[in-house]
């Protein structure tokens, strides 16, 4: 995922995040698919999750492997929930605009 190259300057941190992504990619997509209505939304959720993980790299580097996996699961789930809430808000605004016409 190219996001590592743009968000993380440190080579070791970038390698760590790449490993986290590779080890958890299928899991992240599986969780995101439970909340997404299409493939593009699923990819957006995973991308947003990876971005959040990169921002918290100092915190997650200190986690043991089992805790790291749980952290990733919760991060994807929370990102997906926030994504759905945001989509619902957008749809509500669109509906209000169309009702005003």
Where in this protein do the model-derived segments appear?
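Short alpha-helix-to-loop micro-motif enriched in aromatics/charged/Gly
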Residues: 58-64
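Structural recognition of an alpha-helix C-terminal capping motif at a helix-to-coil junction
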Residues: 30, 44-51, 55, 66-78
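Membrane-interface starts of transmembrane alpha-helices
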Residues: 38-42
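Arg/Lys-rich amphipathic alpha helix in sigma70-family domain 2
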Residues: 59, 73-95
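N-terminal module of bacterial RNA polymerase sigma factors
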Residues: 1-27, 34, 55-57
């Amino acid at each position: 995922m190219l996001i590592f190259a743009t968000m993380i300057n440190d080579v070791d941190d970038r390698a760590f995040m790449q490993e986290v992504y590779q080890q958890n990619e299928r899991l992240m997509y599986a969780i995101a698919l439970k909340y997404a209505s299409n493939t593009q939304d699923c990819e957006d959720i995973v991308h947003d999750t990876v971005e959040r993980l990169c921002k918290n790299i100092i915190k997650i580097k200190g986690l043991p492997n089992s805790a790291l996996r749980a952290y990733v699961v919760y991060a994807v789930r929370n990102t997906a929930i926030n994504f759905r809430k945001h989509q619902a808000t957008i749809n509500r605004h669109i509906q209000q605009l169309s009702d005003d016409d």
